[in-house]
Amino acid sequence: MQHPREENSIVVELEPSLATFIKQGFNNLVKWPLLNIGIVLSNTSTAVNEEWLTAVEHIPTMKIFYKHIHKILTREMGFLVYLKRSQSERDNYITLYDFDYYIIDKDTNSVTMVDKPTELKETLLHVFQEYRLKSSQTIELIAFSSGTVINEDIVSKLTFLDVEVFNREYNNVKTIIDPDFVSRSPFIVISPMGKLTFFVEVYSWFDFKSCFKDIIDFLEGALIANIHNHMIKVGDCDETVSSYNPESGMLFVNDLMTMNIVNFFGCNSRLESYHRFDMTKVDVELFIKALSDACKKILSASNRL
C-alpha cells in the first residue's frame, strides 16, 4: 500500500552560478501564504486563543489547495479555513479533516469550498481534556491566507458563520494582525557546487508532478520577468547600485542577480566588490535560454519520482 506521505529529493547538476540563481530566485519569489489572519469566534477549550491561532497559521495548506497553486503564487487567489467543533464523549480530538477549506477569488471575492482528502484525519491538531457533559468544550475560528483584504463584500460571502460575531471579534484583533505578506517556501532548496536540490514531500492523494510543474513554471516566468526589468548603471561606480564603467572596465556588484549573471559568463564576482570584467561577454538571451533549459531539466528529474 502506498504511504500517504513520502520525503523525496529532486537533484540536477547545473552550472554553479545558474544553480545559485535558481535557488535564490525560489527562496525570494516562491512564497506560499500562511494563515496569519486568524479570528477566534468562540472558545471554551483549555487552549487560549493565541495557541489556536499559532497552530492554525502553519497548517500545511499546499497539500489541500494543490489544484490552485499557480493562482495562489501569483496572488490571484487566496484561501481560508473554518473550524466549528464541539467536544463529545466519542470524539475528543480535532484533526485537519474537521476544518472546512475555501478558495477565494480575489477579483470577485467569491468563496468556494474545496474537497478535503480523507487522509487529513490522520493529522492531529488538538486533544480536548476529559469530557464532561455539563462543560463540553467548543472552538470556532476562521483564518485567512496572508494578503487577503477583509471587507464588507468578502464578509457577506461567509454565509456559514454569524457575521455579527465575526465583525465584533475581527474588530477586536485587526490592529494586531501583521499587515505584511507572511509566507513560507514550499520546499527547502540548496545548490552546493551546482548540485541544485529540492527537498519535497509527496502525498498519495494528488499528482505531485503536476503541482511541482506549476511551481517551476511560475518560478521561471518570474525570474525571466526580473531579468528583463533588471538594470545596471553605466558610468561612474558609486557603490549604491550595481554599475559598470566601460572606460575603465570596472564592474561594481551590488545585487545577487548581477552577481549570478556575470559569473555565468566567466566573472568571479562577490557582492559589494569591484571586478575588472568585459560586460560585452554578457548575453542576456543566452542566459535566459540556459535558465529555461535548466527548468526543463528540473521537471524531467521530478518525473522520475
Swiss-Prot record:
InterPro entries found in the cross-reference section: DNA-dir_RNA_pol_35kDa_poxviral (IPR005059)
One of the record's GO molecular function terms: DNA-directed RNA polymerase activity
Keywords from the named record: DNA-directed RNA polymerase, Nucleotidyltransferase, Transcription, Transferase, Virion
Main location: virion
GO cellular component, one term: DNA-directed RNA polymerase complex
Superkingdom: Viruses
TM regions (residue ranges): none
EC number: 2.7.7.6
Transferase keyword on record: yes
Reactions listed under catalytic activity: RNA(n) + a ribonucleoside 5'-triphosphate = RNA(n+1) + diphosphate
Location in the cell: Virion
GO biological process, one term: viral transcription
Enzyme category, top tier: transferase
Complexes and interactors: The DNA-dependent RNA polymerase used for intermediate and late genes expression consists of eight subunits 147 kDa, 133 kDa, 35 kDa, 30 kDa, 22 kDa, 19 kDa, 18 kDa and 7 kDa totalling more than 500 kDa in mass. The same holoenzyme, with the addition of the transcription-specificity factor RAP94, is used for early gene expression.
The family this protein is said to belong to: Belongs to the poxviridae DNA-directed RNA polymerase 35 kDa subunit family.
Task of the protein: Part of the DNA-dependent RNA polymerase which catalyzes the transcription of viral DNA into RNA using the four ribonucleoside triphosphates as substrates. Responsible for the transcription of early, intermediate and late genes. DNA-dependent RNA polymerase associates with the early transcription factor (ETF) thereby allowing the early genes transcription. Late transcription, and probably also intermediate transcription, require newly synthesized RNA polymerase.
Record-given protein name: DNA-directed RNA polymerase 35 kDa subunit
Naturally occurring in which organism (per UniProt): Rabbitpox virus (strain Utrecht) (RPV)
